[in-house]
């Protein structure tokens, strides 16, 4: 039978871990990125990289999710920031709502694997597993998930003509 004192002491020891000190700092970094507009700049950079491909805006969303995950470590912060930025822009570009939401939610989910993932840090501390090894184990699957999403978006863009509108074509009509 567990007594309250043992549970409290175990919880206190768990919170004293040096690895857990990273959690609030990554959350704060994600907050600062969202408030300073850095996420929007990351998005514009990703858009410039992949806008020439069919479905480029969806690809830019996934690319931004991966980059933001690699900086903030929080999949929830990635999904919330990207939903504010990407979904309105996807509506302008005639993406179906179900596809926009799916791309943003899936892109945010990639953040669970891309280091420095807060989930991996907490799991490593709780199970006394090497966090460095967990990070190394998460990189390849996270990038493969992003690649799989790229392929799905490109296939969808080849089947739905409205998704194939190029970024440069849209910019020409805005001016």
PLM feature spans:
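Membrane-embedded alpha-helical segments and adjacent helix-loop junctions characteristic
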Residues: 2-89
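Interfacial loop-to-helix junctions that mark the boundaries of transmembrane helices
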Residues: 10-17, 132-140
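Alpha-helical transmembrane segments and their lipid-water interface positions
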Residues: 20, 26, 73-77, 111, ...
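Alpha-helical transmembrane segments of multi-pass membrane proteins
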Residues: 23, 55-69, 93-110, 134
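Juxtamembrane helix-boundary/capping and inter-helix hinge elements in multi-pass membrane proteins
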Residues: 37, 85, 89-98, 126-129
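Membrane-embedded alpha-helical segments of transport systems
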Residues: 68, 103-122, 139-148
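Juxtamembrane and boundary regions of transmembrane helices in multi-pass small-molecule transporters
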Residues: 123, 133-167
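Conserved small/polar residues in nucleotide/adenosyl-binding loops
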Residues: 168-175
């Amino acid at each position: 039978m567990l007594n309250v004192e043992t549970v409290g002491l175990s919880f206190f020891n768990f919170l004293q871990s040096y690895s857990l000190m990273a959690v609030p700092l990554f959350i704060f970094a994600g907050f600062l990125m969202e408030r300073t507009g850095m996420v929007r700049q990351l998005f514009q950079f990703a858009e410039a990289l992949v806008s020439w491909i069919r479905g480029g805006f969806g690809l830019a969303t996934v690319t931004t999710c991966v980059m933001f995950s690699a900086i903030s470590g929080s999949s929830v912060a990635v999904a919330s920031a990207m939903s504010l930025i990407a979904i309105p822009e996807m509506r302008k570009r005639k993406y179906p709502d179900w596809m926009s939401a799916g791309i943003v939610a899936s892109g945010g989910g990639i953040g669970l694997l891309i280091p420095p993932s807060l989930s991996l840090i907490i799991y490593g501390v709780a199970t006394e597993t090497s966090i460095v090894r967990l990070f190394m184990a998460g990189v390849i699957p996270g990038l493969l998930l992003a690649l799989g999403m790229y392929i799905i978006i490109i296939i969808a863009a080849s089947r739905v003509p409205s998704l194939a509108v190029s970024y440069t074509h849209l910019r020409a009509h805005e001016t």
